[in-house]
From Swiss-Prot:
Purpose: Alkylcitrate dehydratasee; part of the gene cluster that mediates the biosynthesis of the antihypercholesterolemic agents phomoidrides which are dimeric anhydrides. Within the pathway, the alkylcitrate synthase (ACS) tstiJ and the alkylcitrate dehydratase (ACDH) tstI produce the decarboxylated monomeric anhydrides by coupling the C12-fatty acyl product from phiA with oxalacetic acid. The pathway begins with the highly reducing polyketide synthase tstA that catalyzes the formation of a C12-fatty acyl-ACP, starting from one acetate and 5 malonate units.
Name of the gene: tstI
Family as reported in the entry's similarity comment: Belongs to the PrpD family.
GO molecular function, one term: 2-methylcitrate dehydratase activity
GO CC aspect terms: mitochondrion
Subunit structure: Monomer.
Organism expressing this protein natively: Talaromyces stipitatus (strain ATCC 10500 / CBS 375.48 / QM 6759 / NRRL 1006) (Penicillium stipitatum)
Record keywords, A-Z: Lyase
Record's protein name: Alkylcitrate dehydratase phiI
SUPFAM superfamilies xref list: 2-methylcitrate dehydratase PrpD
Pathway membership: Secondary metabolite biosynthesis
Reaction(s) catalysed (UniProt annotation): (4E,11E)-2-hydroxytrideca-4,11-dien-1,2,3-tricarboxylate + 2 H(+) = [4-(deca-1,8-diyl)-2,5-dioxo-2,5-dihydro-3-furanyl]acetate + 2 H2O
E.C. numbers: 4.2.1.-
A Pfam family the protein falls into: MmgE_PrpD_N
Length: 474
């Protein structure tokens, strides 16, 4: 009887895309994919060396245990099962809020899915090398497949983010990490399209929520691989369906384009550890700060600051009152603006920590209170337009003596593909992060190897092995 009930169409569409779509041979998407993979691994190395807090989450659940042929966690000597390995790499990529971002009605970070993809591929590759009896037909476990998996995961998450505001229903955006990672990892594990439909059928905190979602995606794939079936209509069921109680059964999800390779070509690279909607505001503040200094004034001379922002920025990162921790601070537009004025340069992860001189600064608190925000419809429209995908902020500064520093408008901050500085700064970011643990020769070799489509994933991951940096407390 249940065999006659079709799976929900969005689930069928995702499975068909993952299994049947061929990425165009144009090098653009693959070039971007190589870039986001290196950027994400660079972010992982940065976290290892800058966040002792994140390192407490790393390593086997039971200290001292090992997993045969497991995933080698980059930057450490840990060898982990694919589920814990996905979580740990997800923590390292995401924790300092320095990994890439993608905007729309929902904001998210498609690179979160790479933790699942890399962990699963490395584990399968090492297991395959030690067994000649497996009957499962995996796709080739090479750099080329890694690139294809990344492009498809980015596309699934990116397309769903454009016009579907999960946050409006109190749902964490990492649900899309689970969706994209489960879909792609089921293909990597050699499952059929029908099995993928079960694997992608899922129903989800700042530093580790995406890691948890990616980990759950791998776990769901393993359950499906073992024969568990997914529900066929979690979206459309008349009583309990997700769409019935959220976006509406008739409206459904809004997908303005078919799945292809668009998202990977429109990703926003994070060149500073700061919630993405605040980056253009930081750049505007740096410009205004230089103007302020050039005319002989200081921050204490500011009467108030007027901001024109997108609706998304106002909703997600406008905060008044006390900020309780680092995650609270790097997700506060008033904090990052004040920080830019006080510091005079891009923020660093350390600027958000409890022991930072800015975290308990009266000057910081006073300046935050002087920032007035107004949602601007034109900036919001540009942000939501899939052809423009701007992330704009307009900033006007008023001084106590009546002087007005004319508005500085930043629509395409560094990190946006339309900003000519992005490519160079992206490369600098990667090299800076990697130098925390690797020599220039090793970094050059890693960059060379990402261009080798036929290289086994395990060989690539081996390039990142280092002594353990985790400090497990469990």
């Amino acid at each position: 009887m249940t065999d006659e009930i079709p799976f929900d169409k969005p689930i069928r569409d995702i499975a068909s895309y993952v299994h049947n779509y061929t990425i165009p041979s144009s090098p653009t998407s693959f070039k971007h994919a190589r870039g986001v993979i290196l950027d994400s691994l660079g972010c992982a190395i940065e976290t290892l060396h800058r966040s002792s807090e994140a390192c407490t989450l790393l390593g086997p659940v039971i200290p001292g245990t090992t997993f045969p042929y497991g995933f080698h966690l980059p930057g450490t000597s840990y060898v982990l099962d694919p589920v814990k390995g996905t979580f740990d790499l997800g923590v390292l990529i995401r924790y300092l809020d320095h990994n890439d971002a993608f905007g729309g009605a929902e904001w998210g970070h498609p690179s979160d899915t790479l933790s699942a993809i890399i962990a699963v591929m490395d584990w399968l590759c090492r297991a395959e090398q030690r067994s000649s009896t497996t009957s499962i037909r995996y796709p080739p476990l090479t750099i080329k497949t890694l690139l294809e998996a990344a492009i498809k995961a980015y596309e699934i998450q990116g397309c769903y983010q454009l016009q579907n505001a999960f946050n409006a229903y109190g749902i964490d955006h990492v649900i899309l990490v689970k969706l994209a990672a489960a879909s792609v990892c089921s293909w990597l594990m050699g499952m059929t399209e029908t099995q993928t439909i079960s694997g992608a059928n899922t129903t989800s905190r700042k530093g580790w929520a995406a890691a948890d979602a990616a980990m759950r995606a791998v776990h769901l794939c393993l359950l499906t691989h073992a024969g568990q079936l997914g529900s066929k209509q979690p979206l459309n069921d008349k009583r309990y369906g997700f769409l019935v109680h959220t976006f509406g059964l008739e409206a459904g999800f809004a997908l303005p384009r078919a799945f292809g390779d668009w998202a990977i070509q429109n990703i926003f690279t994070k060149l500073m550890p700061c919630e993405g909607h605040g980056i253009s505001a930081v750049e505007a503040a740096l410009v205004q700060g230089r103007k302020l200094k050039s005319c002989g004034h200081t921050v204490s001379d500011i009467k108030h600051i007027d901001l024109r922002v997108t609706a998304a920025a106002n909703l997600i990162i406008s905060k008044i009152g006390r900020l309780y921790n680092a995650a609270d601070r790097d997700h506060c537009i008033q904090y990052v603006i004040a920080l830019a004025f006080l510091k005079g340069r891009f923020p660093d992860a350390e600027d958000y920590m409890d022991d930072s001189p800015y975290a308990n600064s009266k000057e910081m608190d006073d300046l935050r209170e002087k920032i007035m925000m107004k949602v601007d419809q034109d900036l919001t429209q540009g942000y939501l337009d899939p052809e423009r995908k701007s992330c704009g902020t307009g900033m006007t500064v008023y001084l106590n003596n009546g002087t007005v520093l004319d508005e500085v408008l930043v629509e395409y901050p560094a990190g946006h593909l339309k900003n000519p500085r992005t490519k160079e700064l992206h490369q600098r970011k990667f090299e800076k992060n990697m130098r925390l643990a690797f020599t220039d020769a090793e970094i050059a070799n890693i960059v060379k190897c990402i261009e080798d489509d036929e290289m086994p994933i395990s060989s690539f991951v081996d390039l990142f092995t280092r002594d353990s940096k985790g400090m497990a407390k469990l």
